[in-house]
């Protein structure tokens, strides 16, 4: 069984890496380029994400958050070392007392453009950002960890999500798309700003109620878990939509939850 408290202990000397990421680089659209550059990119990114300790939280090895980054390279300028991609980012969480894993994040970043030369080493300092590729993966590392923590305690990811917002503000000087406020309502800035908007607290509460009080309870008492899920959907999801109609967070969440929700209510009219 996975220990809930291990996600919540700060400053532990045994703190370890939080993420177990799998990176996939789909470069089928690119011809005439040595595949080794894509292989090196994939290996560099997995080391960067998986070997770094992003917070002071204590995660056992078997508690690391499984996540996937599927990058599709649309253009590659080998003279300038610029990759123009879109990225599908997904993160999962185990459900207590079961073999089932549930998705906690699934979204496409259409502005995943960066510079990378083969054998580059990624350096990262969130206060003085000067590397777009490191900033992209740090952003999603903080976002995923913060969302995961929200599923284990109400607003539990606040500190980590604030770090994600701080990084986003510091990334404004990077000359790449996706970081600017008001560019569109689905870019990286818009997503993290919405998570931290007080009007979206019902959406954050939904994460705890749905996963911890709902799914985690279903192995012991399916009806009680289902009731918790119904209540939070009717109250918190509805309230989040009313509070901020232009936010895409509820729609993104509903899109990747629709199949799971159908299974939860299967045979229940």
Residue ranges with predicted function:
Residues 1-19:
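Bacterial Sec-dependent N-terminal signal peptides
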Residues 17-84, 95-97:
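Start-of-domain marker
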Residues 24, 211-269:
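A cross-kingdom marker for long, charged
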Residues 28-35, 123-131, 243:
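Second-shell loop/turn segments in exported
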Residues 170-236:
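Alpha-helical segments in soluble extracytoplasmic regions
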